[in-house]
């Protein structure tokens, strides 16, 4: 892990370019009854790249050597050849300390480090490389929590003038992307994630009334936007 932390000491480049390593998802769910899950990396570039992966518990500034996690990523550092792929395996070492009655959220980090061109090495010039970091939601879901697809329908909405109190009584993380009247103009200005058994207040562009039925869009396990109808209490 100390070796991974050294990557954060790199000086970033003067030039920016898009990620060459593509990940096969926008979020990852670890079912409690599975031995491991896999994450597929694909290098779309014409040159190899180094990729390092680690999990954090929400502190994006924490370096890998300071993070304690029950999960093991293999390999933590890998070379992904040009036009090729690499499979990361994530295994739960021990579920001690993890809640058994609700989901736990982690973040999967991927740091892509492009190679130094041979011509630059030969010229003996100082090289500033750009390391590109991406973060993905990584949710541990204990077995026996029930149907995640129906979770958003259980959200409790309470009108409070031009704001809306939203309570999530379920054991699941629910990300609400949009609230509207019958799929019309969005009443909310930003996406909000609700932790299990938590509440938040959302500012709305116009007031809603008790008894009104709203369309609530939430993001499912596959990153798709799914609309459900919820009545304001």
Swiss-Prot record:
Signal peptide location? 1-18
Q: Does the keyword RNA-binding apply?
A: no
Compartmental location: Periplasm
Keyword tags: Chaperone, Fimbrium biogenesis, Immunoglobulin domain, Periplasm, Signal
Please name the Pfam families in this protein's record: PapD_C, PapD_N
A Gene Ontology biological process noted in the UniProt record is: chaperone-mediated protein folding
- Describe the function of this protein: Mediates assembly of pili by forming soluble multimeric complexes with pili subunits as an intermediate step in the assembly process. This protein is involved in type 3 pili assembly.
PANTHER family to which the protein is assigned, alphabetical = FIMBRIAL CHAPERONE YADV-RELATED, PILUS ASSEMBLY CHAPERONE
Q: Which family does it belong to?
A: Belongs to the periplasmic pilus chaperone family.
Protein name (database record): Chaperone protein MrkB
Q: Could you tell me which species this protein originates from?
A: Klebsiella pneumoniae
- Taxonomic classification, please? Bacteria, Pseudomonadati, Pseudomonadota, Gammaproteobacteria, Enterobacterales
């Amino acid at each position: 892990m100390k070796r991974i932390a050294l990557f954060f000491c790199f000086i970033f480049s003067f030039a920016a370019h898009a990620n060459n390593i593509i990940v096969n998802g926008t979020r990852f769910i670890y079912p409690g009854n599975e031995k491991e899950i896999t994450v597929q990396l694909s290098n779309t570039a014409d040159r190899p790249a180094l990729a390092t992966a680690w999990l954090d518990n929400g502190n994006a500034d924490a370096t890998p050597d300071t993070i304690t996690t029950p999960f093991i990523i293999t390999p933590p550092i890998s070379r992904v050849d040009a036009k090729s792929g690499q499979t990361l395996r994530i295994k739960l070492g021990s579920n001690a300390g993890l809640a058994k009655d609700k989901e736990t959220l982690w973040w999967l980090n991927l740091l892509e480090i492009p190679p130094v061109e041979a011509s630059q090495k030969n010229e003996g010039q100082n090289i500033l490389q750009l390391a590109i970091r991406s973060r993905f939601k990584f949710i541990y879901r204990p077995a026996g929590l029930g149907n995640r697809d129906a979770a958003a329908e259980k959200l409790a909405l309470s009108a409070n003038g031009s704001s809306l109190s939203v309570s999530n009584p379920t054991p699941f993380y629910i990300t609400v992307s949009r609230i509207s009247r019958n799929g019309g103009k969005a009443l909310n200005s930003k996406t909000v994630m609700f932790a299990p058994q938590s509440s938040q207040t959302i500012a709305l562009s116009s007031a809603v009334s008790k008894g009104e039925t709203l369309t609530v869009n939430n993001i499912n396990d596959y990153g798709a936007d799914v609309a459900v109808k919820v009545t304001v209490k």
